[in-house]
Amino acid sequence: SDPIPAMYDYMQITVYDGSFTPAFVVAVDVAGIQLFGDHNNIQDYAEHVDLCIDHHGSNSGYAYETLVDDHAAAAAELLTELIPQMGVELTPEIAACLYTGVATDTGCFRFTNTTANTHLAAAKLIEAGADVEKLNERLFECRSHARIQAEKMALESLEFYYEDRCALICLTWI
């Protein structure tokens, strides 16, 4: 599995270390078992998922129970509704994590999957304490050194064709 990017280090993420057998397995925003990754034998549980909460219409239905709403812009949008229904308070920490999911899946509310319900979910998360200014800056304005270097390489290779109607960028990875 890929490491968790540093831009998400404000979240309290615990990576499964394989030291226990989960009693209940919930997959969120995972449309198929092939997307589980390979970290610490997580594939051992991929075929034993009790519940999947997802917003992808392409969800393969691999879990014993599946909640899929392909009208939702993000699984985090669904969780914003579900968590209070389970009697759990939307704390500022939870709200920040869910806002991150909604904002990233919608391109900061610019993509066509963004609906009025998406904005209502974001409003609930803001009311619960998500620091939108800080989160949006971190998610969409800050760039890692590696990303800046990649952008530099891309721009250095930029060429225009057909009276500047077509632009070509070439990036190679070693």
Describe each PLM feature range.
Residues S1-M7, T21-P22, T104-I174:
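Hydrophobic helix-and-loop "lid/oligomerization" segment in the mid-to-C-terminal part
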Residues S1-Y45:
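N-terminal small/polar loop signature for handling phosphorylated ligands or for N-terminal nucleophile
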Residues F20-P22, A46-E47, A63, E163:
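Residue-level preference for short coil/turn positions at secondary-structure junctions
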Residues F24-V26, V49-I53, E65-V68, A167:
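Hydrophobic/aromatic beta-strand patches that form the interior of the parallel beta-sheet core
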Residues V30-I33, H56-S58, W173-I174:
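Short glycine-rich anion-binding loops that position phosphate/pyrophosphate groups of nucleotides
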Residues G37-H39, Y62-Y64, N113-T114, L135-E137:
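A short secondary-structure junction signal
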Residues Y45-N59:
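Acidic-glycine-rich active-site phosphate/pyrophosphate-binding loop
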Residues H55-A121:
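Short alpha-helices
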